[in-house]
Amino acid sequence: MMNHDTESHVKISRTIYRGVSPSTTRLESRVRELEDILDLERDARVRAERHAADLSYQVDALSERLDEAGGSTTQTQELLKRREMEINKLRKDLENANASLELAETSMRRRHQTALNELSLEVENLQKQKGKAEKDKSHLIMEVDNVLGQLDGALKAKQSAESKLEGLDSQLNRLKTLTDDLQRQLTELNNAKSRLTSENFELLHINQDYEAQILNYSKAKSSLESQVDDLKRSLDDESRNRFNLQAQLTSLQMDYDNLQAKYDEESEEASNLRNQVSKFNADIAALKSKFERELMSKTEEFEEMKRKLTMRITELEDVAERERLKAVSLEKLKTKLTLEIKDLQSEIESLSLENGELIRRAKSAESLASELQRRVDELTIEVNTLTSQNNQLESENMRLKSLVNDLTDKNNALERENRQMNDQVKELKSSLRDANRRLTDLEALRSQLEAERDNLASALHDAEEALRDMDQKYQASQAALNHLKSEMEQRLRERDEELESLRKSTTRTIEELTVTITEMEVKYKSELSRLKKRYESSIADLEIQLDATNKANANLMKENKNLAQRVKDLETFLDDERRLREAAENNLQITEHKRIQLANEVEELRSAMENLERLRKHAETELEETQSRVSELTIQVNTLSNDKRRLEGDIGVMQADMDDAINAKQAAEDRATRLNNEVLRLADELRQEQENYKHAEALRKQLEIEIREITVKLEEAEAFATREGRRMVQKLQARVRELEAEFDGESRRCKDALAQARKFERQYKELQTQAEDDRRMVLELQDLLDKTQMKMKAYKRQLEEMEEVSQITMNKYRKAQQQIEEAEHRADMAERTVTVRRVGPGGRAVSVARELSVTSNRGMRATSMM
């Protein structure tokens, strides 16, 4: 009997040790979980500190850039102010985040400390209960006198165990659903990871596109600078050419005036020569008639002298000889005069020919004068067209200024969008960290539930072992049952008190858990409202930006159409200019009655040239402004590249957070597999319990009558225990439902965050398309600038050709001037010869010959001038 009692005592102590071990394991697991949570909080704080250090470094870099670009323009000052405001906001956010992290860390430490204290109190209570249970079991070894009552209690315990098993089955089903949800979340997170990787690749491609765009902008900048230099040189050349043309026009006008005066003088001399020729012919006819009359009179006198003065033959012979000498001289004069008449006739014929040539030349000069007048009219039209083109260029310059301003505004908008995207990425990071914290909290609660389930399983195992021990010790306990009835009543009261104390402790722990849950709910709700407001504001800003970008795109399309129309107009203008140049080469002389108009037009051209010079200076100033703006744009592009690098770093941090979340989910899957194994173990234990139940029923039928009195008390105690157990189970079930609801809310939040990330991705793609449109616009503007440069080169070539033509005309003018000088020299020589010959007898004929030679020389001079 004593050996049997010692064996039963050893078995009871073993069962009690097994019943206490799950609580210690639960405490150890709780401590480990708390340590893991502390490690996670520390890692999060380290990451936050690193992020704060990165932000401070970025803030320092931005401040240096702001100091470097401080005195550029008012726009940069406004940008600096905005950036400083954003930096202050970021600093405040960092300080708030650090403060919130420190508060959360202190609150978590306090909670962990309180939880450890409560767990230590529970361990002490369990140790006390263990001692009391050992005492009770040592007494129960001697006091089991009515096994039927114990068997009834075992049956009721079985029923309660079955109800507990049903509750555990429901919990298992819920846990299975939770595991399925966790698996779904794992798949969703994997998909999100794949999306994030794809987004990372897309961001890398976008980065490359931005770098290519930056290179294109730099090339466009260099090409624009070269084009501006070419335009400046072409404008200078045009101004010089126009001054040269004005000087040539004035010289040509003076030459034309001189030629007109000479032409008038020559026409007067020709009329004088004609009058002299007519007079000379009349003199010749008079001389012929006179000489004939004199001969007739001489012959009559000679016959009368023969008839009347035969006596005076000697005198008459002398007179005859004299007359004969006179006749010889007259015949000589006659021959000379005939020769001179022939020469004069030939000279008259040559003069008539020269006169016809002069008439033809006068007609050609009149036609040239009409053509020059037409050219002057065309030049006036060209001047008007140039003024209109100048106005158009001024309007185009203003539009280009507006385009540059729009581009600067777009760059500012892109910078703001990049900042907003950075803020949104930071908010998403914080939301992911919060989600990770919530997952860790859920895992901790799950571990608590697992520990409670382990406790229940250990209690069931202890109950089974106690039933087995009671079955073995039934024979030894019958003698001591009567003696132990009164003691059992006292012990039952003590057990009731212990159950009440346990109930109070459990209610206290449940209240603390409810308080923590309410705090977490309030925190999550506040965070949700804050995130919702931020996302709504970001969505509104993005919609406004989309409207602005759409308007800008419409304006750019309109400007493209206007520029295409302008290109067509410029091409038509170039064709007109070429035609006018061809007409101008054929029309270089101007008539006299249009000379005043030409002078007025020349003055107008001078004023137009002055206006063009002023416009050129204005264009140079505007080009300098555009160069400064291009430099500002390059600075902004550099800032955008730095922001891109910062975004890449943030994406790397997000990927690390995603890897941590995936590892946590893998740990959750491992826990789910462990739960399944524990479910299988519980099923095996239920089978063993059913077998024991069959044995107990066989014994119960034999010992029903002996244990009715004790069964009443045991039923009351068991009813109390079942009521308390049901309450605990209901509370735990309610807690599990709340945790499930929180988990569903967290999953919905994750889905909303993913949807918002997709929205941001779409917005980023839209911004990328806008950037491509801007790049196309820049390329089109570059093409237009190239075309204008080609046109300016064509204008330059035309001006060079005009200069060559003007040089040719100047050479012709110089040759004509030399010929005129030679003709004047010849005229002077002829006048000298005439004065010399006038002294002699044939002065009149010599003067006529001189006049004819002068007219011939002047005709030759006119032909050389033509």
Swiss-Prot record:
Belongs to the paramyosin family. Changing V567I: In strain: Chinese. This is Paramyosin. Paramyosin is a major structural component of many thick filaments isolated from invertebrate muscles. SUPFAM superfamilies: Myosin rod fragments, Tropomyosin. It comes from Schistosoma japonicum. Homodimer. Residues 1-22, 840-866 are annotated as: Nonhelical region. PANTHER family: CINGULIN-LIKE PROTEIN 1-RELATED, MYOSIN-6-LIKE. Keywords: Coiled coil, Cytoplasm, Disulfide bond, Motor protein, Muscle protein, Myosin, Thick filament. It holds the Pfam family Myosin_tail_1. One of its GO terms (cellular component) is myosin filament. Changing F720Y: In strain: Chinese. It is found in: Cytoplasm, Myofibril. Residues 23-839 form a coiled coil.
